[in-house]
């Protein structure tokens, strides 16, 4: 029985690996690796340090993906050969193969996840904004807890988190924060986090220890490259400088060079107060504005598309995507995919890959169903 079952598993692994190879294309990755090596060998490579870092990160991602594909190919081939030569009575070898299959499945699952990241902007860095909802200090503490969750997730991914703007609460937590998450496919992984996150718990700020419900809104945007043209006219901008303010502590870098930019036609406002010079803050704020304007254009196109399709969507800033219940029981549930876990401590410490994976699979399935209709 074990032999028949494991043979079937090895055949399934081969099929899944071939599907992954069709999408990720080892040949294209090999070609891209050569191009990236060529870029890195150019004399002026380090002139733009930000772009140089992006090239290095991309090269690391391509090389790791290629190595995983090569190792998987070897492992599956070895398993296929072992299946053919192992007798049914050799239970020790079958047991060893069972463990090897589990290991191959783990790596294959990682690569399958990458196949869902094929959107035009998925490979980009991501701007992540968290805004506390109504509810005073409790809501601000919840926003801060989410901020820590995403920072821990990014650390585990090897991503860099650059603070762009933050407004601390007077008592605890934060009213809002914007960061730039830098790393390959940061936007692709994080895009499904956009929406409203709801917390239910006994509030540590309530002397009567009552249960409170708090909300925080998460917004995710791709960082826009210079080669993507978003027209921003100087006459459409209102630029103000101000002194960074807040409750002090770890978040606030006191400076007279903070910059706030308002895009007059749309009313979009962005600010940056973390850099030491006004020029740097202005540059970072303009980059963020560009991302917001791009997101606005994409939203308009999406709405137009929905009109043509005759569909209505409830996805938006006010859409609740996930609930985090800490009391009277412990459960975190994604309201779109149905994925849930009772291990709230791990999730709040950045273990959100299962939620990200379930969203990407759910979205791919929805798109497949839509294209078939």
Curated annotation (Swiss-Prot):
Question: Which key words tag this protein in UniProt?
Answer: Cytoplasm, Methylation, Protein biosynthesis
**UniProt cross-references to InterPro entries, sorted A to Z:** PCRF (IPR005139), Pep_chain_release_fac_I (IPR000352), Pep_chain_release_fac_I_sf (IPR045853), PrfB (IPR004374)
Q: Which residues carry this modification: N5-methylglutamine?
A: 250
Q: Which domain of life is it from?
A: Bacteria
- Provide the disulphide bond pattern: none
List GO molecular-function terms, semicolon-separated: translation release factor activity, codon specific
Residues annotated as coiled-coil are: none
Q: Where in the cell is it found?
A: Cytoplasm
Q: Does the keyword Cell membrane apply?
A: no
User: What does its PTM field state?
Assistant: Methylated by PrmC. Methylation increases the termination efficiency of RF2.
Q: What is its main location?
A: cytoplasm
A single Gene Ontology CC term: cytoplasm
Q: Which PANTHER family match?
A: CLASS I PEPTIDE CHAIN RELEASE FACTOR (PTHR43116:SF3), PEPTIDE CHAIN RELEASE FACTOR 2 (PTHR43116)
User: According to its UniProt record, which protein family does this protein belong to?
Assistant: Belongs to the prokaryotic/mitochondrial release factor family.
> Mind telling me which HAMAP family this protein's record contains?
Rel_fac_2 (MF_00094)
Q: What is this protein called?
A: Peptide chain release factor 2
Q: Which organism is it from?
A: Aquifex aeolicus (strain VF5)
Specify the taxonomic lineage. Answer: Bacteria, Pseudomonadati, Aquificota, Aquificia, Aquificales
